[in-house]
């Protein structure tokens, strides 16, 4: 059986890390695309030269033309400008929207059957625009955000409780930005909910609130520390887990930026919700029961995303 083909559009820090993780997992052959000559070729060669040491067999290729992605099973999009200190994800909209238009055209021409994962910020608006530009079915185009935000939430909780991160479950709803909604009620440690752990004296509500805020600021914290770039290890790991669920048809339940067509009372919008990912792409959107406070926070987040989509339409009226 022929190996799967995974195309990476954008060969920066996330793109290179994606290629390395995919190689280590032997998920499929990798093609790296970038408009900068030499960068995708150099990274592909460097990672390929690590394969005898790490013992993996995949083909890695770098190129500067879109035809290299032809027939890809999965396309992961990281192309665009990354945040710098003092910038919000939303500040990138104008520049990265133009990039999504070019990427969408390339995917439409060469990889129209692929499962597409978008990482470019501002995430929810960019994946919405990318789906429109590419014309691919909505269930085959998703955004990577919820897994990353949930991973940050889980990591901070594991540090607070001094326990294995494997025993922490948590997920974050809403847009990938300041209005994201970490759901305390649905987050557990060893199956025990966070509100119950507060009652048991394991932590305080004040500390949980601090962790929620740190989760919201997770990306900005890394940007301020790095000074010349943004997070790439955790975003890459998150996207690979989504690609793996699709390629192996594992039916993973994960939070992603998915297209809503009435679920949660939202239409024609990409926003973070729990879904089932399998060979059909997004096979099911899971509608969880939200209390009044959670619903209000989610609606605020959706509104912020929709305003960004309106800003996209102002720049590219064809998206309407």
From Swiss-Prot:
It catalyses: (S)-malate + NAD(+) = oxaloacetate + NADH + H(+). NAD(+) binds at residues 10-15, 34, 96, 119-121. GO terms for molecular function: L-lactate dehydrogenase activity; L-malate dehydrogenase (NAD+) activity. Substrate binds at residues 83, 89, 121, 152. Keywords: NAD, Oxidoreductase, Tricarboxylic acid cycle. The active site is at residue 176. Gene3D superfamilies: Lactate dehydrogenase/glycoside hydrolase, family 4, C-terminal, NAD(P)-binding Rossmann-like Domain. GO terms for biological process: lactate metabolic process; tricarboxylic acid cycle. The keyword Transmembrane helix does not apply. Its EC number is 1.1.1.37. The keyword Phosphoprotein does not apply. It is an enzyme of class 1 (oxidoreductase). Belongs to the LDH/MDH superfamily. MDH type 3 family. Catalyzes the reversible oxidation of malate to oxaloacetate. This is Malate dehydrogenase.
């Amino acid at each position: 059986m022929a190996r799967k083909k995974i195309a990476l559009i954008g060969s920066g820090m996330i793109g290179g890390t994606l290629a390395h993780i995919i190689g280590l997992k032997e998920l499929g052959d990798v093609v790296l695309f970038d408009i900068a000559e030499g960068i995708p070729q150099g990274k592909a060669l460097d990672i390929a030269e690590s394969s005898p040491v790490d013992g993996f067999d995949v083909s890695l290729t770098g190129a500067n033309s879109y035809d290299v992605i032809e027939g890809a099973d999965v396309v992961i999009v990281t192309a665009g400008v990354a945040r710098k200190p003092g910038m919000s994800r939303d500040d990138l909209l104008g520049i990265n929207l133009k990039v999504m238009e070019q990427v969408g055209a390339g995917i439409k021409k060469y990889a129209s059957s692929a499962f597409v994962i978008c990482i470019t910020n501002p995430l929810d608006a960019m994946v919405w625009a990318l789906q429109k530009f590419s014309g691919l079915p909505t269930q085959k185009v998703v955004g990577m955000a919820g897994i990353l935000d949930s991973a940050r939430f889980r990591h901070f909780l594991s540090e607070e409780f001094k326990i294995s991160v494997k025993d922490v479950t948590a997920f974050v709803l809403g847009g990938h930005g300041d209005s994201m909604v970490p759901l305390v009620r649905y987050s557990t440690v060893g199956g025990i909910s966070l509100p119950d752990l507060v009652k048991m004296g394991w932590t305080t509500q004040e500390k949980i609130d601090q962790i929620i805020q740190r989760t919201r600021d997770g990306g900005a914290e890394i940007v301020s520390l790095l000074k010349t770039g943004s997070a790439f290890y955790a975003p890459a790991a998150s996207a690979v887990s989504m690609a793996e669920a699709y390629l192996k048809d594992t039916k993973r339940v994960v939070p992603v930026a998915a297209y809503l067509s009435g679920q949660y009372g939202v239409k024609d919008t990409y926003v973070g919700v729990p879904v089932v990912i399998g060979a059909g792409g997004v096979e099911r959107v899971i509608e969880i029961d939200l209390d009044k406070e959670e619903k209000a926070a989610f609606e605020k987040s959706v509104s912020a995303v929709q305003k960004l989509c309106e800003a996209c339409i102002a720049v590219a009226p064809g998206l309407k």
